[in-house]
Every structure is written in structure tokens, then in C-alpha cells.
Amino acid sequence: MIKIGSYNIQKAIGMDARRKPERTLKVIQEMNCDVIALQEADKRFGPREATLTPQQIAEHTDYKVVPLATRDASIGWHGNAILVRRSMDILEFERLDLPTLEPRGAVMADVQINGHRVRVAAMHLSVIGTFRKRQIASLMDQLHARSNALPTVLLGDLNEWRDKAKSLKMFPDHFEVTSPGRSFPSAFPLASLDRIITSPEFTVQQSGVHRSDTARVASDHLPVWAHLLIGSPDTP
């Protein structure tokens, strides 16, 4: 069993408009996932400083940062970061450009989880529907172009309000799109903006939204998660 999660941390700024990294780190630790995709992990302008430093993450959580950043002060690429348990092997990683009018991107990491090599792709998509479709198409093309196919999980803030939206149809038909629940805004969730998409090698056993008291105030999004099995339920 693998537990994977996604969390738009809004640069560690909570619903009280205060930047409190220790609060965000508490939520990350509460989630207790094997892999966590973060969105808005870095500040948007200037040196793109991380709002959670690798030192803070190491001190306050059981995770380490996949080294995706191109700037010394950052932990991600266009705000997208991936955290994995300290004991986990990071086998490969890559930054992926996405078409858009504003700075957007996705990140990918191949990791070893419970004896399985798994590919994780994390994203934060455009607020404009046309660009969301193009971004998903581009992301899938880049993943399919890789020489080695692996069990794949895609996740993040898709900025898509409707479960039957055209943008979600850009994922292959044999992939499962999971909406764990309403995650935005965190105080009174109305929309399922955060989703988890899995290739056929995975079975989604359970999914949900992390709704702790701290999570309700730490960001404008609540984290989402899913328990995954590799292989069908009948596989011994």
C-alpha cells in the first residue's frame, strides 16, 4: 500500500494572512504520506525563495526534498515541489515545461516505494481552461516520450472546478481521475480543485481530504490524499 498526497501550501500563508511555515510543516507531518506534491512552495518573484527550507523540512518532518530547484533559495520548479520519506530512494527527476501565458511547470520524480519503482508527476495548472487542456496534453506527451514506462501517479492543483470538464478528458481513458473531495477554500470547501490521477497499474483503495484544525487555517487549500495498491485487487 502506498499513500500519496497533494497540498497547495499558498507560500505558507494561512487564512489569517500570516506566513507561518511551522504550521504548514505540521500539516505535512499530519498527512503521513509516502510522497507529497506541493504547490506554491516557493515565492513567485525575485530569487524565488522557498517558504519551507530543506533544513526546516528535515527538522520538523520525516521527509526530504527531491532536488528539482534551479535556484539555490528554492525547493521547486515554478512552485512545484515533491517531498518523499527520508528512507526512500530518489532514482531520477526532471523539470517539465508547460505551455502558458504565465510561469507554469510540472515536475517528475521516479522513486522506489516498497520495492516498486514509481513515477510521480506533480503539477499546478492554469486558471484558464484552454491552457489547462494544452498543459495536460503536453504533460502526457512528455511522460509518454520517456524511454521507460512506469506505474505513474499525477497529482496537484488542477484549478478545475468540474469533474466532467473537457480538460480532464485530456488524460488517457485508461487512467483513473480521482477527486478526493472538496478542498478549496479550506475554511468552507466548495470545489474539488486538487486531484490524483493514476495509471492502470494502480488501484485506488481510498481517497480523502485532510481536514485537521491546523489544515483549515494553514492555507487556502486543504490537502488531499489517496491509498494506492500496485496491481489489481486480485493480484496475489
PLM region descriptions:
Residues M1-V35, E59-H60, K64-P236:
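Active-site regions of metal-assisted phosphoester/phosphodiester hydrolases
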Residues A12, Q39-G46:
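Active-site neighborhood of divalent metal-dependent phosphoester/pyrophosphate hydrolases
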Residues F45-P54:
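Short, flexible, glycine-rich and Lys/Arg-enriched loop motifs at helix boundaries
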